[in-house]
Amino acid sequence: MNLEPPKAEFRSATRVAGGPVTPRKGPPKFKQRQTRQFKSKPPKKGVQGFGDDIPGMEGLGTDITVICPWEAFNHLELHELAQYGII
């Protein structure tokens, strides 16, 4: 005669009986786009090239945007220039 109580069988709660065994996947990974897309159009350049009007800048030509590219956008605030990647 067996006086021991019957032992309960414990099964893993994470496994589904009869289901395939696959490793758990983490959250989906999103790739960041390399190019920015804006809903509004980027700002247009204002007055370009002051030439010899600026003291100390004589002889550099009228294409001042090479030296000071922000001068072409002097009508905008810094945060607007940064928003469009100009600075």
Curated annotation (Swiss-Prot):
Write out the ranges of the annotated region (Disordered).
Answer: 1-55
Q: Where is the composition biased (Basic and acidic residues)?
A: 1-12
The protein's enzyme class: hydrolase
Pfam families per UniProt: PDE6_gamma
Domain of life assignment: Eukaryota
Q: What's the catalysed reaction? A: 3',5'-cyclic GMP + H2O = GMP + H(+)
- List the EC numbers from the record: 3.1.4.35
Q: Which InterPro entries does the UniProt entry name for this protein?
A: PDE6_gamma, PDE6_gamma_sf
Cellular component GO terms held in the UniProt record: photoreceptor disc membrane; photoreceptor outer segment membrane; plasma membrane
Query: Which GO molecular function annotations are given, in alphabetical order?
Result: 3',5'-cyclic-GMP phosphodiesterase activity; cGMP binding; enzyme inhibitor activity; spectrin binding
Q: What sections of the protein cross the membrane?
A: none
According to the UniProt entry, which residue ranges have a biased composition of type Basic residues?
26-44
Which family is this sequence assigned to? Belongs to the rod/cone cGMP-PDE gamma subunit family.
Which PANTHER family does the entry mention? RETINAL CONE RHODOPSIN-SENSITIVE CGMP 3',5'-CYCLIC PHOSPHODIESTERASE GAMMA-SUBUNIT-RELATED, RETINAL ROD RHODOPSIN-SENSITIVE CGMP 3',5'-CYCLIC PHOSPHODIESTERASE SUBUNIT GAMMA
Q: What does this protein do?
A: Participates in processes of transmission and amplification of the visual signal. cGMP-PDEs are the effector molecules in G-protein-mediated phototransduction in vertebrate rods and cones.
Instruction: Look up the record and name the associated disease.
Output: Retinitis pigmentosa 57: A retinal dystrophy belonging to the group of pigmentary retinopathies. Retinitis pigmentosa is characterized by retinal pigment deposits visible on fundus examination and primary loss of rod photoreceptor cells followed by secondary loss of cone photoreceptors. Patients typically have night vision blindness and loss of midperipheral visual field. As their condition progresses, they lose their far peripheral visual field and eventually central vision as well.
Task: Please report the name of this protein according to its UniProt entry.
Answer: Retinal rod rhodopsin-sensitive cGMP 3',5'-cyclic phosphodiesterase subunit gamma
